[in-house]
Regions:
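Short, charge-enriched, intrinsically disordered boundary segments that mark the beginning
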Residues: 1-26, 360
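Positively biased amphipathic helices and basic secretion/translocation or surface-docking motifs
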Residues: 21-56
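Gram-positive cell-envelope targeting signals
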Residues: 12-19, 35, 66, 75
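A residue-level detector for the "anchor" residue at the start of short, highly conserved motifs
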Residues: 46, 50-60, 69-360
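Intrinsic-disorder-associated interaction segments
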Residues: 5-8, 24-27, 31, 47, ...
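Alpha-helix initiation and N-capping motif
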Residues: 9-12, 31, 35, 278
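N-terminal cationic amphipathic segment used for targeting or macromolecule association
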Residues: 10, 62-63
Length: 362
């Protein structure tokens, strides 16, 4: 800009000098040439000023658009990460209810439905339809502003499959309670779990899926993983099959898992992730139980869940280590017979309880 001003000044000075010079040296051609040069410089200066104004307006608009985009994006993601304890408060404030022999589905409005089948299949649709074992049992009114929760309570000896309204599939193990909404809103997908579930989460990059428990939560976009969080046990765990998950405890400490990794949670504290063979942790979905160098008391705790039978173990039996694989579709008598090939034990039935005794001192 300064250069253009200097050029115009230079030409103007020459024009003034020309007027002061002798008329003999003045010709119309010279005058026209000087005037054209002045007009040319003025046009250049005007064009430059116009270009600068356009560039300024464009730059200012771009910066404003970027900041607006950042603000809106921040607002969008803040809706995910602002702590919302609605479902946790609901789950923890419910009167403890256990299912003695049948699977119980508690729907909004205190409606209780007994699901008789051992391996029931419950499906929620986006339009509000609920189907249990191919039978439509309820047509829910979808309300945009009101979040209503369901509870699925599985007794010992039973398992079920649950499909949520977004298409996420859950395999729910024995002795488990799951709290979930009839449908998910646009900003949040959350469920609450006590017990054990295996999940195949429907992928939605705009809406993370969060599994909450008493001591920790797991956040994903779409993946396959197992959560074990029985209140009666001192340890919980998360095992990742596919994708990635982020686990966060109540102290906000976070751990990220890669496929084939497990994290244990003791009293709410996250251990370091470790690589494991995932099959023993997830084979219950296929009605199998795998164990390698496991104490017998842990094996029988799992059998207590799967079959709903109470086992009383001789102290000498509790810490015996066994390895093997059990088909949980078989009768309990056959399963116990299989275990007896791995350890020196025998069984006695008394008062609807099974006593597991040692053969060593007989």
């Amino acid at each position: 800009m300064e250069k253009n001003k200097s050029n115009i000044t230079h030409v103007a000075r020459r024009l003034i000098q020309h007027f002061r010079s002798s008329e003999k040296t003045s010709t119309p051609t010279g005058m026209d040439e000087l005037w054209k040069r002045i007009e040319s410089q003025v046009r250049i200066e005007r064009a430059e000023n116009t270009r600068r104004r356009i560039l300024y307006i464009f730059t200012a608009s771009s910066v404003a658009a970027i900041f607006l985009g950042i603000f809106l994006l921040g607002q969008h993601f803040m809706s995910y990460y602002i702590e919302d304890n609605t479902i946790t408060e609901f789950a923890e404030n419910q009167i403890s209810q256990s299912a003695d022999s049948e699977i119980i589905l508690l729907m909004p409005g205190k409606k209780e439905i007994e699901v008789g089948a051992n391996d029931a299949n419950i499906v929620y649709s986006q339009c509000g339809t609920v189907v249990v074992n191919s039978d439509t049992i309820n047509q829910l009114e979808v309300k945009e502003k009101e979040m209503e929760f369901n509870q699925l309570i599985i007794p010992k000896g039973k398992r079920t499959q649950l499909t949520l309204s977004d298409g996420t599939r859950l395999w729910v193990n024995s002795g488990t309670r799951v709290v979930y909404p009839s449908y998910f809103n646009k900003n949040r997908r959350e469920i609450y779990v006590e017990g054990e579930i295996y999940l195949d989460v429907f992928h939605d990059e705009k809406t993370p899926f969060i599994v909450k428990t008493k001591d920790f939560q797991v956040q994903v976009l779409g993946t396959v993983f197992n959560v074990s969080a029985y209140p009666s046990e001192g340890m919980s765990s998360v095992v990742l099959v596919e994708g990635s998950v982020n686990i966060k405890n109540q102290s906000k400490k976070q751990v990220k898992l890669a496929p084939g990794q497990l994290v244990d949670i003791h009293a709410g504290q996250l251990d370091a992730p470790k690589n494991v063979d995932i099959e023993p942790y997830v084979c219950w979905v296929k009605n199998m139980l795998m164990y390698t160098n496991e104490p017998l008391d842990r094996v029988f705790k799992k059998l207590n869940l799967y079959y709903g039978k109470e086992f009383i173990l001789d102290p000498e039996v509790e810490q015996m280590l066994v390895s093997g694989k059990l088909d949980l579709k078989e009768k309990l008598e056959d399963v116990l017979h299989t275990i007896s090939f791995s350890a020196p034990i025998y069984y006695e039935n008394l008062d609807d309880k099974i006593y597991v005794l040692s053969l060593i001192h007989i």
